[in-house]
Design a protein with these regions (language model features):
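Soluble FAD-dependent oxygen oxidases
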Residues: 2-502
Length: 502
């Protein structure tokens, strides 16, 4: 079977970072939630019994069975969070009732789809959590458009679309929610061929701070539609459904090349020149795995058969000095199997790919993460590698350009259209090791800033990111502020890095 990130890093002894080789943290953890460790700040309270009577779904408060599981997000580092209640919404009217109740009380509210916020912003203390996981339908129309509920997980989206012979360019982590991914842009293994997930959006149904359900598009409230295409989850309102254009499901050829320890500078140097010259059909990432010395691996996929990919891999080998990989895997898949390969759950059912399906905790993982943006090829790739020398960390450098770069930065809220790649910094940890991991992550991030600059990807949101608003949004920040002021003048949808807070 193809070697995935999880098996690779377990073999390397890096444990918690295993699944991160393709961008989705997680290995099996079956321990119960940690006890409450902190109490959140005191906020105005919603009168929950009247709200509960308005909902078709459940409203779970701390005194009710199921609260311990319902409050939990993807990352166990946030298992000490104590929301005031979790509203398990089933229809748009439930979401409207929650928004109206929070606005009337002046109480904090947050939407949660997959619960993958790197900073835990979808599970704040003392807030009403609007859990959209039951609003997860995927309907494919005859013309190939797909209407997808705001709570759908990526593995379910891919599975449903495959049944209709369609595909949507999106992320690789199976339990990530379609909402957070799309609202931050949506980088994935098909981005160079088809663009970001948000580039496929035709319309969005969103409940704004006044409780109104709005369906927005390029022709209906276009400023809000623009902001929802890269402006970040948690801002502007709660999205209940998306309408996407999809593409015919392509054949994919996946690959992984692992190179000898000590060759990482040559691997990164060759890869960055290679990906800059590849056709749109080729997507790839270069992973630099910390150690003494660091090592490098290149993974990716090609839209087409192996016969089209193999000459491109030969070119890569030449560019890195004809170093022979210690492992070379090339395998053809249909689109769904290819996405399951990158998700690291090829041997599991769609339900088992969820982080909390039937109580299954197989891919919950404690980690810290952040990002930087690589705008142009590095003059000295060894500088990046040296940052990871002696560290148990991983930098995943995902190639962009192609279709992503053919849309202007001002045309959507996602600002990094001209970038060569995103750089995700990832450290597996534990609740007791969190402070040390966060410190190490910040050191790596800040050292990389001196090499590549201060840009960052909002979907790898980092609570300690310096100059975060400019880093995430660049020249689009002013317009995003204007949209937020128009649709959320009282700052209902707020959190430490909300657009309403700048």
């Amino acid at each position: 079977m193809p070697i995935n990130r999880r098996t690779f890093l377990h073999a390397a002894g890096l444990g918690a970072a295993a699944a991160a080789l393709t961008g989705c943290g997680g290995t099996q953890t079956t321990s119960p939630p940690r006890p409450f460790e902190t109490a959140g700040p005191v906020h105005p309270s919603i009168d929950f019994p009247p709200l509960a009577r308005k909902l078709s779904g459940s409203l779970i408060t701390p005194d009710q069975p199921g609260y311990q599981l319902a409050r939990r997000s993807f990352n166990p580092l946030f298992d000490n969070r104590t929301p005031a209640a979790i509203a398990q919404c089933r229809r748009i009217e439930d979401v409207q009732a929650c928004v109206s109740a929070a606005a009337a009380a002046g109480a904090p509210i947050a939407a949660r789809s997959g619960g993958h916020s790197y900073a835990g912003y979808s599970t704040p203390d003392s807030a009403l959590i609007v859990d959209l996981s039951a609003m997860s339908s995927v309907e494919v129309n005859a013309g190939g458009t797909a209407v997808i509920g705001g709570g759908a997980r990526l593995i379910d989206v891919y599975t449903a679309l495959a049944g209709a012979g369609r595909c949507l360019p999106a992320g690789s982590c199976p339990s990530v929610g379609i909402a957070g991914l799309t609202l931050g842009g949506g980088i994935g293994v098909l981005s160079r061929k088809y663009g970001l997930t948000c580039d496929q959006l035709l319309s969005v149904t969103v409940v704004t701070a006044d409780g109104t359900a709005r369906t927005v598009s390029a022709s209906a409230e276009p400023d809000l539609f623009w902001a929802l295409r890269g402006g970040g989850g948690g801002n502007f309102g709660i999205v209940t459904s998306f309408t996407f254009a999809t593409v015919p499901a392509p054949q994919l050829t996946v690959f992984q090349l692992d190179f000898p320890v000590g060759s990482a500078p040559d691997v990164l140097g060759g890869w960055q020149q290679w990906i800059s010259n590849m056709p749109d059909e080729l997507w790839s990432k270069c992973n630099i795995i910390g150690g003494s010395p660091p090592s490098g691996t290149v993974i990716g996929c090609y839209v087409g058969p192996a016969s089209g990919l193999n000459p491109l891999l030969t070119d890569l080998n030449h560019r890195i000095g004809n170093r022979q990989p210690t492992l070379r895997t090339v395998a053809e898949h249909d689109c769904l199997d290819g996405m399951r390969y990158f998700a690291g759950c090829s041997a599991k059912s769609a339900a088992e790919c969820h982080d909390q399906a039937s109580g299954n905790q197989w891919n919950r993982e404690a980690f810290v993460g952040t990002s930087r943006i690589l705008t142009t090829p590095l003059a000295d790739p060894a500088q990046i590698v040296s940052v990871l020398d002696g560290r148990r960390a991983l930098v995943m450098i995902d190639g962009l350009r192609g279709a992503v770069g053919r849309i202007r930065s001002a045309d959507t809220a996602f600002p990094h259209r001209d970038a060569l790649a995103t750089m995700q910094i990832y450290l597996g940890t534990s609740p007791t090791g969190r402070a040390a991991a966060a410190s190490s992550m910040a050191q790596i991030r800040d050292q990389l800033t001196g090499i590549v600059g201060g840009g960052a990807y909002v979907n790898y949101i980092d609570a300690g990111m310096p100059n975060w608003a400019q880093a995430y949004y660049g020249d689009n920040l002013t317009r995003l502020r204007q949209v937020a002021q128009r649709y959320d003048p009282d700052r209902l949808f707020t959190f430490p890095q909300a657009i309403t807070s700048v």
